[in-house]
From Swiss-Prot:
Monomer. Interacts with MHC class II molecules alpha/HLA-DRB1 and beta/HLA-DRA chains. The interaction with MHC-II molecules occurs at both zinc-dependent and zinc-independent sites. Interacts with T-cell receptor beta variable 7-9/TRBV7-9. Pfam families: Stap_Strp_tox_C, Stap_Strp_toxin. Residues 1-27 form the signal peptide. Zn(2+) binds at residues 211, 249, 251. Binds 1 zinc ion per subunit. The zinc ion is necessary for the toxin interaction with MHC class II. Its cofactor is Zn(2+). The lineage of its organism: Bacteria, Bacillati, Bacillota, Bacilli, Bacillales. It is found in: Secreted. Staphylococcal enterotoxin that activates the host immune system by binding as unprocessed molecules to major histocompatibility (MHC) complex class II and T-cell receptor (TCR) molecules. In turn, waves of cellular activation, cytokine production, and migration into the lung tissue and airways occur via alphabeta T-cells. Also causes the intoxication staphylococcal food poisoning syndrome. The illness is characterized by high fever, hypotension, diarrhea, shock, and in some cases death. This is Enterotoxin type A. One of its GO terms (molecular function) is metal ion binding.
Length: 257
C-alpha cells in the first residue's frame, strides 16, 4: 500500500514538473471575446507599424543607468544613452505623471522598452529617441536565477504549447512592457500576428493577460492600439506598469474570426 502511494505521489510530482501548462481559464475574466477589436479596424499604417515595432525594431535595453535630467516634468532624459546608433545619442523616457518620475529620477535604474524617433518630441532634434516607461529600479531587484514565464495560448479555443524560453526576465519587479514585447515578438514569428490577410495573417482578434498571485491582472487587446505611428501605438506603456515576476504566468487568446 505504501509503495503504491509513493508511486502515485511520484507520478503527480513528475506531471507538475514536465507539464508546459499553468493555471488558466479558456475565457478571460477581464475582456469579453466579443469586445476585442478586429484587425480590420486598425487605422491606415498601424498594422505595418505594429509589425515593425514588435518584430523588427531594436529595443532599448541597459542596466544601472542614472539621470537627473528632464525635458518636461513627466520625463527623464538619458544623455549619451546610445553609443553606436546611426542617428540617436539620447533617450527621452515619458511617463504618465510626475509621481512616477520622482520614483526613478536620480536613482540607478534598468531600462527595457520600445523606442521611436519619428514624432519624438523633446531633447536635441534628430538626435533624441523617445520611449514610454520601461524603467525599473536597479538595486535589490535581481532574481537569484532567470525567470522563464509560463504561457498558456489558445487559438480559437484550442490550447497550443508555447516554449518556456519565449518570455524571460532576471528582475523581481518587471515592467509589463518588457514581457509584452517578448510575447508579441513570438506571436508575430509563430502566428504572423501583425501580417495582413494576404500575407497569411489569419489572426483577426487577440488578448494577452498577465496574471500574478498577488496583484490584479494586466491585459492588452492585441489590436486595440490607437493611432497609426509609434508615438501613439506605444502609449499603452506610459504608465510604466510593473508586476512581480516570481509567481506569474501569461494567458493569450487568439481568434481567426
Amino acid at each position: 500500500m505504501k509503495k503504491t502511494a509513493f508511486i502515485l505521489l511520484l507520478f503527480i510530482a513528475l506531471t507538475w514538473t514536465t507539464s508546459p501548462l499553468v493555471n488558466g481559464s479558456e475565457k478571460s475574466e477581464e475582456i469579453n471575446e466579443k469586445d476585442l477589436r478586429k484587425k480590420s479596424e486598425l487605422q491606415g499604417a498601424a498594422l505595418g507599424n505594429l509589425k515593425q515595432i514588435y518584430y523588427y525594431n531594436e529595443k532599448a535595453k541597459t542596466e544601472n543607468k542614472e539621470s537627473h535630467d528632464q525635458f518636461l516634468q513627466h520625463t527623464i532624459l538619458f544623455k549619451g544613452f546610445f553609443t553606436n546608433h546611426s542617428w540617436y545619442n539620447d533617450l527621452l523616457v515619458d511617463f504618465d505623471s510626475k509621481d512616477i518620475v520622482d520614483k526613478y529620477k536620480g536613482k540607478k535604474v534598468d531600462l527595457y522598452g520600445a523606442y521611436y524617433g519619428y514624432q519624438c518630441a523633446g531633447g536635441t532634434p534628430n538626435k533624441t529617441a523617445c520611449m514610454y516607461g520601461g524603467v525599473t529600479l536597479h538595486d535589490n531587484n535581481r532574481l537569484t536565477e532567470e525567470k522563464k514565464v509560463p504561457i498558456n495560448l489558445w487559438l480559437d479555443g484550442k490550447q497550443n504549447t508555447v516554449p518556456l524560453e519565449t518570455v524571460k526576465t532576471n528582475k523581481k519587479n518587471v515592467t509589463v512592457q518588457e514581457l509584452d514585447l517578448q510575447a508579441r515578438r513570438y506571436l508575430q514569428e509563430k502566428y504572423n500576428l501583425y501580417n495582413s490577410d494576404v500575407f497569411d495573417g489569419k489572426v483577426q482578434r487577440g488578448l494577452i493577460v498577465f496574471h500574478t498571485s498577488t496583484e490584479p491582472s494586466v491585459n492588452y487587446d492585441l489590436f486595440g492600439a490607437q493611432g497609426q505611428n509609434s508615438n501613439t501605438l506605444l502609449r499603452i506603456y506610459r504608465d510604466n506598469k510593473t508586476i512581480n515576476s516570481e509567481n506569474m504566468h501569461i494567458d493569450i487568446y487568439l481568434y481567426t474570426s
